[in-house]
Structures are given as structure tokens and as C-alpha cells.
Amino acid sequence: NDLHEEVPALGYVLGDEGSGSYYGKFLLSSYLYNKLPKEISDSFDKKFGLSKDEIIDKVYKQPNPNVFIASFMPFIIDWKNNPFISDFIVNGLKHFLEVHVCCYQNYEKSSVHFVGSLSALLKEELDMAAKEMGIVINSIVQKPVGPLVDYHIKYILDKQLVN
């Protein structure tokens, strides 16, 4: 099958829907706007002890702000059963699916495959978002090395050995 790009990758500032930096931006802005539920805010304070000025400095003045922002994903995963975080996770995944899956013709007749830690860690939420949107997920692979080796053995090496 021929694939072609429908949606450009816009990076963590303009895009990156459903990524660690996408969710990290939400967490940090919610924290700085005092919108986090108290138990999450208190836990954030206890775990990180970051002031507004420190966060602003790391995001706007230090190198690799995307790495800093995405580094809060384990904290978000720890709180994913809280309705405030859970709702945002599911809505973020729906946004990802709208932008990167629904752009293809007949997407509802195809199945989608996901690779990576975040999709594996958010499997339940991803399944829920996809189901609500009529998207069929065929597989979620946390670490693709094993399946890649299997593919190469089955399709690439096999052909080379026959010829």
C-alpha cells in the first residue's frame, strides 16, 4: 500500500497532540493557573517543589524545554484515574485521532496500529477514545524492536535467502 502524508508534523509548540509535551503543557498551565484539584496540586508541590519563576525559566530560557515539559508525563500517569486528568487524557487522545487518523478517507473501515510507551501506558484511554470515534485499533506495541525483528526475518531475510 502506498502511504502519503495528510497532516504535517508541527512539533511540540504547534502540534504534538497526545504526546508527553502536550499533556505536560496542560499540567503546567493548569498548575500555574491554579486549576488543578487540590490533591493533585499538593502532590505536584511535594514532588517537584517548583515555583512559577522556575517553571517559566525552564520553559522559556533553558535549552530543551520540550524535554522538561514532557518529563511530567510519569506524574500525569500516576494521576490518570483522577477525573480531572482522565478527562483531559481522553480528550487529548480524541484530538490526536481527529487530526492524525480521521484525516484519511475511509478511516473507519481501516484499523490503526500504535507504537510507543505512551500509547501502551494509556491503552485503556486510547481504546475508549477510539471506540467513541468509531476507530478500530488493531495493535498497541510498547517496544517495537521485537516485532521489527520478526518482520525482517519473515519478509526480508526470507526473500534474500530464497534468491
Where do the model's predicted regions map?
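Phosphate-binding/catalytic loop of phosphoryl-transfer enzymes
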Residues: 1-39
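ATP-binding/phosphotransfer module of carbohydrate and carboxylate kinases, centering on a glycine-rich
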Residues: 28-163
